[in-house]
Regions:
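Residues lining hydrophobic/aromatic ligand-binding pockets adjacent to catalytic sites
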Residues: 1-233, 244-245, 264, 286
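Basic helix-extension-helix modules of the SAP/HeH family
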Residues: 229-297
């Protein structure tokens, strides 16, 4: 089974829960909520709606998976998961948590009392990417049965077990400021299908600025085999995107704010707005119409 959702609510909860049946709760990374609040989240969601939970940063960033202190915070996360009926708890370590701390991670995962929880771990940073480190990590995660979390456009998980958990952070130079093209989502589908099996569920969580749109398009592709139109087409598509910022605005501001967004020139061709605006004069524009006069495609 493939499950699709977003990291946090990019739109209102009602609209989100009408579209998806999965969300990763991110606010728990910054503050442990009251149980009464958590119960309300569960009660207000549809019965078949699934929560996953991101563990508080004290576990990973402050205590760096060191026993005792990290274990205490882990125990505090369990009632949150239980009251949400969440079966997955995500631990995300920072890029400063490098492979030389693997022993601490192994001891932590061996020591936690998971009960019904599946604990998954997202490593961050380039130090985890060389083959020797990946093989060592695979051996440890398999031994403690902790699925590895990655962005599949950067690297595939070294171990999944019964759950593959993927988090998409954006692929551009500014990462989060990114929109996935139909071509990229088609490749994502290929990756996801290669991980899915009768014994393994695949969770796909989008965590980029256009996460709601991208996750919706990916869900539609999974269900129908086709992508819905991204926007209007041709000049109308450009107008639609240009209308999303305030004017007057400089070229550099426009490029920074919305240059990463995709334009559909026709049914077969998507380009980023920044490609169309690259050669327009560097000046202040009073409105979208002034920009359109300078654009050729």
């Amino acid at each position: 089974m493939i499950k699709i959702g977003c990291c946090g609510y990019p739109v209102g909860r009602k609209k989100y829960q009408e579209t998806f049946r999965l969300v990763e709760i991110n606010r728990t990374f910054y503050k442990i909520p009251k149980i009464s609040t958590v119960i309300k989240w569960r009660e207000e969601a549809p019965a078949d709606f699934e929560f996953t939970v991101k563990a508080h940063q004290d576990i990973s960033h402050k205590y760096k998976l060191k026993l005792e202190d990290a274990l205490k915070v882990f125990e505090a996360m369990k009632p949150i998961c239980q009251n949400l009926a969440a079966k997955i708890l995500l631990i995300q370590t920072p890029a400063s948590f490098k492979p030389d701390r693997l022993k601490d991670a192994e001891e932590f995962f061996k020591s936690i009392r998971r009960e019904e929880l599946t604990v998954v771990w997202e490593t961050r940073g380039p130090s985890w990417e060389d083959e020797e480190t990946r093989e060592t990590l695979r051996h440890i995660l398999e031994s403690v049965d902790v699925p590895h979390v990655t962005d599949p456009f950067k690297s595939l998980p070294v171990y999944t077990g019964s759950i593959a958990y993927l988090r998409l952070h954006g692929s551009g130079p500014r990462m989060y400021y990114y929109q996935y093209s139909n071509e990229e989502l088609t490749e994502l589908h290929r990756i996801v299908k290669s991980l899915e099996s009768d014994e393994r569920e695949v969770y796909v969580l989008f965590n980029n600025l256009s996460m709601f749109e991208d996750a919706s398009r990916f869900l539609s592709f999974i269900e129908t085999g086709r992508f819905p139109p991204l926007t209007l087409r041709g000049t109308d598509s450009i107008k639609d995107i240009l209308s999303r910022i305030k004017y007057p605005s400089t070229k550099s501001t426009i490029m920074k704010r919305i240059g990463w967004r995709l334009i559909e020139l026709d049914e077969q061709k998507q380009v980023r707005l920044e490609e169309l605006l690259r050669d327009i004069p560097s000046r202040t524009y009073k409105n979208a119409e002034e920009i359109l006069k300078e654009v050729t495609f």
